């Protein structure tokens, strides 16, 4: 027989969980449960399977323990699994001796055959061993003895179960083998490898202890009998309907509702289905557990099981929620979701304190309202943040506390009662709101307190206050040590022990309630964290409590004897101000605010000055005010006493409350008061309006004398009798003529609007950073400096330099240079305060940074040059520098700024403009406009004077002026023509600008007229006159003026040596070396010094060539003759004696020349005199190298001349650029293509042939002539473009159809010669080719429709160069369709180029479909040309018009050249 099989289960106790029993159903009280019956707690469980314990198998050969041995062993209670009900199983003895189903009886009452913990509950009396016989009604007797031992060695004592003990007979399972696993592994060891081997004692002892003490709990109280046993988990799992679309779990009530008895109510029905689902869960768990073979995480598996079971019970409403305290994170999230403050939980249960001790730094630094308003018990005081308790106290510590020698007694206390709690006193005083007649003066938030001396640290300024105030850092301060032995729970005793004066302030016993609980945390402060211990003269620590107002208040020294009565009640209330000022220290931001009348309570965050004991004893008396301390933000808090105190320095220097008599504290940015010598950072402080003079400014006895003044950061200094210290950023010198200080200095705002005060006439002007002054006589310069003018005050210079200068006062220089002036002068007025970036109070006006300044009267003795040169000008000549960008009214001798116009004679450091010839000798600003006598700025427009130079790019209006480089000017005979501007025909044209008349020399950037003086030629341009230098880019005026570096000078008769590259006049004058502008030459003087590279004529010039002053196109032929202007950047005047740019040729033929050789003496020998190696065409005259105006005689090695120049098929000549066609019409190669040429109408040329009616040739020709107006365009980088996308003539046309095609033309014998020079880019047809068709080009074929006329033409540009292969009108008389034999071809007729006759063409496309589409497009658009048959081609009309325009321009140029030559 097979070894006994058994089925292991997951949470089995003695047996597997949830086994179906055969006992009839019985009452819940009859505690016998079936292991298969699913409790209400257990999820649906695996179906009950027959189990047999290998250890108890009768076939096991192992020796069993005797009955006596088993009886003496310890009986271990049945283990409890995740579900106590489900983990209980039924013993075999209960099954064998079970009463009737109707009579419930406890299972333990049938002890006949003993069941061991390892026994299989399905065995009948432990006698049937095989699974096949287990479930039979009458199983056979076992073959061996029925003794059964468990691994634990103890008989089982089954517990009552809520399920019935009936076990219905089931068919035997198909298999007989199960895993060798204990049926209750939670409490017993695993079975050994040998099925019958008993467990060892060690294993028994260890494993039996695991879950033996687990208490069983019912999942829910049963209201129904146990469901039928046959409804096992396995059967229920099989009953689940198969639904592939089901998502989620399915429950028993959804598909097993028919199994529920109809008499059940809702609760019973839910319990019934819950038990069924728990059985199904148990079955599923067992299946998983068995299949995994113990290789799963048992803890996670158990958690998942419990989770599933709980979900089932929750589904049926049977889950009993446990009272588990939620975690802080869960509570916080829940509160946040429901909008509940986080402090609600803490207020309900205040944290328990440990009676004091050192507190952690992060503990309750901010007060909470809940800590003030709630106490857990009447004996406990709520923990307040301000509580000064520091250590644990015992109840009997009060006696010890009273005996302490250093303990301070309550002032005025008749008995030695201990000092009350500071926190309690504060809360009670706030609740009572008993304001004393004398309250602490109200102060602004940033006002400084009155302190006799500065404290060393901002943390040391928190002074000791009376017991009415507490410190939020009280646990760190000495105030908390005063109550070392007090208990947190002793507040009632404290309340009783306090004096009547204190008790009348209290409303609550425990001090926890407050009228303003949220403010209580902010209303207390005591000793500083760094000043915790105060020691007396003997070195013993002195216990002192904070006194006075909250966070401040006058502190007074106390002796160890009983102290005197407290001064006024300085308790803070909700209406009180807050003072953060630190006593005695300089304010960083320095606005000192006088104290208002003491009408409200104040929280003073600065320590007050220490008072004498007798002073502190006077409660109704206001505290004496000492020297005011400097506030961090500078609001000075001033008291209402008559005794004024010196003002503290405010860093930002705005002082308020002008009604006070005390002197305001100096602000860092404020103007200093007369007596206060401390300077503000930005230096303007505003004193109170009603300040008295020096007798009232004296401090009281308690106040020390004011310290010497410190300079402000940005330096507006008050006028004091003592010499002020220098400013931090002061760039100006201090005022030498300081007078008696005014009582109220005016404050210059940071951006220059100072607050207005009542006595403006008494305030000195301070310089503001941006130099805008308030509308007062005594003003400070604002940073950007629009300052108000006064009659006689010194004006501060603004950075950008608009100043209003008074008559006779020294001006203070502002950073941006606008100075403010003061109204009155007097011995008692302070001078202007030094500005941070250079405003001075000296009598000498200084220049503004950009500074156009108004001229000052003659009293100003010195002008300081601003950074950019705007100055305040005075009558003193030649001392002012000009502002960089600003314009100044010009006194005759002022220095000009770099970019601004000024009126001084001093030249700026970097002068870019030429100086005028006027007697004022003023320099012109680079960009600015100046007065009429000034020289013109480089880029600016100036007013017109006859001697003025024109700006480089600006326009001018005078006839004698030189024209700007790029600007357009009025057309007069003597003006230059701009490069791009239109000028009159009589003017010479410079390269980029308007050229002057013929009397002036043309320069690249300007005009240099020739003079008679012997000056060495400039290396780059025409020489200037003898006395002046030329500016770098500007044009120089008359002979007394400096000449620009590249500019032209007026023409004189001076002798100049020939320049290196330059054009020289034909007189004895020499041309400048490297001339960028051609000079006007006179034909009367033939003797010229030869240039190093060529003739005396400026052969290497970059300006207009010839006498007409126009720019010659280096690549275009001149209209008068066919010789091209080879590389002409500007033709010079024609001379007979000049040689082309040669490296040493004298009068003979140059051996190596870059230009055309000129041989005026023998014009007939041009062929012999041609240069050996010439880059340009030879010429018979001495024209410049880059601009030849005469016909050449020598051939060019790079340009073979071809015969028909510009000839078209119609016989009309057309002008094309010189580099495209040859100039030698007599060349022998006229009918051939020259591959090595820069000119000539060969097939390699980049423009269409003459026979093509494409207007691009005409456009190119016109553009070649128009190059004179845009010579620099030749040097611009060219973008990479597609040459086939479009070209000239297509601007007014739209593409109606486009396809890539090949144009093929039928060429006859008569046409072959005419087509030899076509522009299609194709070679002529070879003789050997017998085909009459010639491919003209492949590329995009476009049907173009004119936007105005509507004419439609076919245009095909051959790839890759874009030359015209096909350009024909669509004839409406023909039908366009693909050829029948070759569907990719469309054959059509078109008019010839000369209009005589027709031609046959074919267009080949890639596919027949494309051919169909092209034919359809041609048919569609040919109607537009029906009325156009007799008209000329539109393109030819454009060509003719452009040719006419070109001819007109050439004639115009010739006339201008003749006029220039005559001049």
Swiss-Prot record:
It comes from the Eukaryota. Pfam families: Nucleoporin_FG, Ran_BP1. SUPFAM superfamilies: PH domain-like. Residues 1-199, 339-568, 609-1064, 1155-1174, 1179-1217, 1240-1335, 1416-1463 are annotated as: Disordered. Residues 1289-1427 form the RanBD1 domain. Residues 481-498 have a biased composition (Acidic residues). InterPro entries: NPC_Nucleoporin (IPR053074), Nucleoporin_FG_rpt (IPR025574), PH-like_dom_sf (IPR011993), Ran_bind_dom (IPR000156). Residues 511-523, 616-630, 753-768, 803-813, 870-881, 1156-1170, 1240-1271 have a biased composition (Low complexity). Residues 1418-1463 have a biased composition (Basic and acidic residues). PROSITE patterns: RANBD1. It is a peripheral membrane protein. This is Nucleoporin NUP152. It comes from Chaetomium thermophilum (strain DSM 1495 / CBS 144.50 / IMI 039719) (Thermochaetoides thermophila). The gene is NUP152.
């Amino acid at each position: 027989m097979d070894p006994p099989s058994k089925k292991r289960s997951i949470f089995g106790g003695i047996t597997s969980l949830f086994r179906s029993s055969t006992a009839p159903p019985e009452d819940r009280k009859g505690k016998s449960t079936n292991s298969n019956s699913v409790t209400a707690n257990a999820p649906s469980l695996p179906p009950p399977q027959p189990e047999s314990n290998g250890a108890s198998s009768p076939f096991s050969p192992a020796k069993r323990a005797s009955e006596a041995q088993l009886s003496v062993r310890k009986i271990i209670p049945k283990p409890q699994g995740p579900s106590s009900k489900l983990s209980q199983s039924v013993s075999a003895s209960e099954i064998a001796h079970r009463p009737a189903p109707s009579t419930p009886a406890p299972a333990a009452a049938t002890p006949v055959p003993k069941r061991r913990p390892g026994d299989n509950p399905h065995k009948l009396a432990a006698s049937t061993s095989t699974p096949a016989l287990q479930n039979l009604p009458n199983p056979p007797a076992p073959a061996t003895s029925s003794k059964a031992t468990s691994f634990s060695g103890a008989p089982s004592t089954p517990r009552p179960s809520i399920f019935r003990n009936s076990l219905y007979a089931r068919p035997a399972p198909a298999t007989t083998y199960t895993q060798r696993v204990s049926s209750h592994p939670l409490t017993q060891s695993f079975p050994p490898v040998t099925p019958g081997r008993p467990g060892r004692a060690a294993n028994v002892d260890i494993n039996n202890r695991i879950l033996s003490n687990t208490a069983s709990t019912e999942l829910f109280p049963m209201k129904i009998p146990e469901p039928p046993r046959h409804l096992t988990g396995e059967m229920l799992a099989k009953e689940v309907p198969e639904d592939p679309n089901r998502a989620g779990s399915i429950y028993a009530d959804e598909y097993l509702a028919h199994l529920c008895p109809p008499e059940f109510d809702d609760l019973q029905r839910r319990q019934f289905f819950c038990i069924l689902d728990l059985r199904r869960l148990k079955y599923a768990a067992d299946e998983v557990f068995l299949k995994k073979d113990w290789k799963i995480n048992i803890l996670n598996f158990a958690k998942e099981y419990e989770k599933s079971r709980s979900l089932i019970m929750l589904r049926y409403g049977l889950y009993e929620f446990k009272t588990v305290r939620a975690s802080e994170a869960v509570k916080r999230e829940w509160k946040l979701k429901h909008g509940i403050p986080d402090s609600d939980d803490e207020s309900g249960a205040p944290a328990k304190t440990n009676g004091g001790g050192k507190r952690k730094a992060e503990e309750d630094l901010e007060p909470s309202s809940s800590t003030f308003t709630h106490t857990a018990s009447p004996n406990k005081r709520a923990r307040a943040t301000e509580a000064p308790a520091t250590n644990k106290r015992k109840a009997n510590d009060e006696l010890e506390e009273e005996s302490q020698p250093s303990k301070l007694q309550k002032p005025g206390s008749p008995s030695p009662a201990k000092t009350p709690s500071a926190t309690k006193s504060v809360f009670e005083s706030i609740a009572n709101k008993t304001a004393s007649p004398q309250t602490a003066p109200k102060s602004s938030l940033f006002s400084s307190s009155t302190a006799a001396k500065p404290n060393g640290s901002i943390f040391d300024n928190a002074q000791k206050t009376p017991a009415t105030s507490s410190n939020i850092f009280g646990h760190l301060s000495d105030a908390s040590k005063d109550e070392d032995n007090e208990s947190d729970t002793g507040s009632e005793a404290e309340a009783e022990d306090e004096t009547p004066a204190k008790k009348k302030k209290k409303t609550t016993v425990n001090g926890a309630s407050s009228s303003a609980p949220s403010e209580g945390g902010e209303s207390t402060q005591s000793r500083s964290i760094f000043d915790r211990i105060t020691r007396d003269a003997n070195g013993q620590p002195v216990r002192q409590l904070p006194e006075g107002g909250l966070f401040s208040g006058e502190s007074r020294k106390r002796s160890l004897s009983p102290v005197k009565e407290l001064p006024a009640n300085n308790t803070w209330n909700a209406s009180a101000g807050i003072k953060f000022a630190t006593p005695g220290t300089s304010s960083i931001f320095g606005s000192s605010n006088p104290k208002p009348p003491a009408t409200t309570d104040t929280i003073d965050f600065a320590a007050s000055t220490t008072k004498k004991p007798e002073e502190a004893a006077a409660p109704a008396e206001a505290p004496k005010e000492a020297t005011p301390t400097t506030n961090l933000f500078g609001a000075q808090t001033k008291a209402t006493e008559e005794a004024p105190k010196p003002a503290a320095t405010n860093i930002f220097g705005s002082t308020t409350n002008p009604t006070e008599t005390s002197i305001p504290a100096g602000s860092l940015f404020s103007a200093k008061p007369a007596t206060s010598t401390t300077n503000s950072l930005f230096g303007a402080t505003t004193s109170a309006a009603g300040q008295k003079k020096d007798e009232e400014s004296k401090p009281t006895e308690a106040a020390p004398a004011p310290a010497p003044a410190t300079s402000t950061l940005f330096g507006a200094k008050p006028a004091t009798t003592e010499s002020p210290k220098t400013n931090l950023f002061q760039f100006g010198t201090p005022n030498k003529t300081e007078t008696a200080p005014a009582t109220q200095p005016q404050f210059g705002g940071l951006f220059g609007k100072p607050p207005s005060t009542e006595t403006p006439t008494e305030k000195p002007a301070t310089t503001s950073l941006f130099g805008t002054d308030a509308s007062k006589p005594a003003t400070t310069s604002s940073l950007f400096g629009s300052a108000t003018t006064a009659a006689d005050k010194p004006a501060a210079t603004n950075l950008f330099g608009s100043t209003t200068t008074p008559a006779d006062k020294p001006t203070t220089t502002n950073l941006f240079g606008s100075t403010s002036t003061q109204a009155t002068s007097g011995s008692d007025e302070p001078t202007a305060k030094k500005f941070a970036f250079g405003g001075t109070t000296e009598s000498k006006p200084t220049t503004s940074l950009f500074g156009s300044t108004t001229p000052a009267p003659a009293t100003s003795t010195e002008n300081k040059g601003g950074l950019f040169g705007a100055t305040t000008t005075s009558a003193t000549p030649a001392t002012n520098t000009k502002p960089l960008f600003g314009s100044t009214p010009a006194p005759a001798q002022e220095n000009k700024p770099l970019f601004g116009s000024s009126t001084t004679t001093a030249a700026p450091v970097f002068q870019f403009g030429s100086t005028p010839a006027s007697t004022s000798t003023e320099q012109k600003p680079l960009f600015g406009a100046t007065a009429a006598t000034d020289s013109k700025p480089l880029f600016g427009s100036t007013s017109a004077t006859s001697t003025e130079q024109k700006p480089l790019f600006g326009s001018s209006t005078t006839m004698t002026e030189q024209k700007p480089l790029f600007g357009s000017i009025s057309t007069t005979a003597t003006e230059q023509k701009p490069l791009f501007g239109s000028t009159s025909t009589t003017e010479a044209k410079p390269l980029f600008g308007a050229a002057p008349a013929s009397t002036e020399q043309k320069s690249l950037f300007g005009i240099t007229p020739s003079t008679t003086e012997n000056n060495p030629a400039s290396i780059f341009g025409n020489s200037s006159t003898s006395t002046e230098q030329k500016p770098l880019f500007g044009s120089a005026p008359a002979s007394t003026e400096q000449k620009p570096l590249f500019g032209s000078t007026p023409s004189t008769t001076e002798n100049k040596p020939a320049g290196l590259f330059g054009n020289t006049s034909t007189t004895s004058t020499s041309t400048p070396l490297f001339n960028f502008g051609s000079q006007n030459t006179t034909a009367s003087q033939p003797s010229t010094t030869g240039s190093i590279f060529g003739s005396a004529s400026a052969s290497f010039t970059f300006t207009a060539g010839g006498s007409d002053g126009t720019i010659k196109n280096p690549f275009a032929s001149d209209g008068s003759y066919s010789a091209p202007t080879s590389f002409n950047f500007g033709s010079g005047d024609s001379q007979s004696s000049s040689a082309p740019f040669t490296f040493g040729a004298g009068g003979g033929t140059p051996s190596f020349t870059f230009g055309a050789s000129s041989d005026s003496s023998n014009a007939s020998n041009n062929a012999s005199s041609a240069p050996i190696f010439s880059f340009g065409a030879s010429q018979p005259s001495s024209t410049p190298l880059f601009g030849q105006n005469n016909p050449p005689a020598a051939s060019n090695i790079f340009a073979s001349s071809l015969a028909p120049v510009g000839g078209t098929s119609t016989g009309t000549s057309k002008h094309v650029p010189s580099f495209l066609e040859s100039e030698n019409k007599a060349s022998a190669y006229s009918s051939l293509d020259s591959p090595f040429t820069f000119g000539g109408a060969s097939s390699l040329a980049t423009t269409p042939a003459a026979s093509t009616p494409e207007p691009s040739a005409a456009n190119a020709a016109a553009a070649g002539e128009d190059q004179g107006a845009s010579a620099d365009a030749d040097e611009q980088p060219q973008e990479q473009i597609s040459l086939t996308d479009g070209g000239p003539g297509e601007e007014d046309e739209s593409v109606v159809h486009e396809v890539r095609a090949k144009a093929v033309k039928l060429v006859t014998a008569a046409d072959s010669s005419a087509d030899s020079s076509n522009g299609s880019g194709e070679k002529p047809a070879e003789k050997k080719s017998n085909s009459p068709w010639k491919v003209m080009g492949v590329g995009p074929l476009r049907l173009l429709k004119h936007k105005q006329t509507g004419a439609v033409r076919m245009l095909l540009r051959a790839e890759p160069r874009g030359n015209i292969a096909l350009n024909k009108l669509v004839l409406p008389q023909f039908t366009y369709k693909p050829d029948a034999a070759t569907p990719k071809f469309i054959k059509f007729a078109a008019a010839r180029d000369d209009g005589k006759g027709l031609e046959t063409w074919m267009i080949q496309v890639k596919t027949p479909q494309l051919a169909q589409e092209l034919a359809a497009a041609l048919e569609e658009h040919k109607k537009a040309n029906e009325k156009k048959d007799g008209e000329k081609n539109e393109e030819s009309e454009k060509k003719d018009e452009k040719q006419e325009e070109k001819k007109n321009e050439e004639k115009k140029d010739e006339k201008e050249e003749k006029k220039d030559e005559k001049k």
